[in-house]
Structure formats: C-alpha cells, structure tokens
Amino acid sequence: MAKKSMIAKAKRKPKFKVRAYTRCRICGRPKSVYRDFGLCRICLRKMANEGLLPGVKKASW
C-alpha cells in the first residue's frame, strides 16, 4: 500500500500542471497506471481475472 501522505499529496491541486501524476484508484500505486482504467497493472490484472472489468478478457491466439 502506498504511503498515506503521498496519496493525500497527490489529491491536492499542484502549483504547476506538469507536477500532477496518476495513481491507482484502488491501492494508490504511482507507477504503471493505465489511464483508461485508472488502475495499476496489478489491480487491473486482478480485476480482469475476476471479471469485474466489462469488455476485458484474457487474450488467446
């Protein structure tokens, strides 16, 4: 789990726009966040496997 102070800091509006960054909505992880879902790769995979993300399915070719 991400540090609570960093999550709170990320929620505040930054002084400059370029300082804003994405965090996972579930765990607060700052790296590897998919913009389409707002989730990190770990939470995205977990939710996709459980079938909680509509339209997402396991690849097979």
Curated annotation (Swiss-Prot):
One of its GO terms (molecular function) is rRNA binding. InterPro entries: Ribosomal_uS14, Ribosomal_uS14_bact, Ribosomal_uS14_CS, Ribosomal_uS14_sf. Zn(2+) binds at C24, C27, C40, C43. It comes from the Bacteria. Keywords: Metal-binding, Ribonucleoprotein, Ribosomal protein, RNA-binding, rRNA-binding, Zinc. Coiled coil: none annotated. Its cofactor is Zn(2+). Part of the 30S ribosomal subunit. Contacts proteins S3 and S10. Belongs to the universal ribosomal protein uS14 family. Zinc-binding uS14 subfamily. This is Small ribosomal subunit protein uS14. It comes from Nitratiruptor sp. (strain SB155-2). The gene is rpsZ.
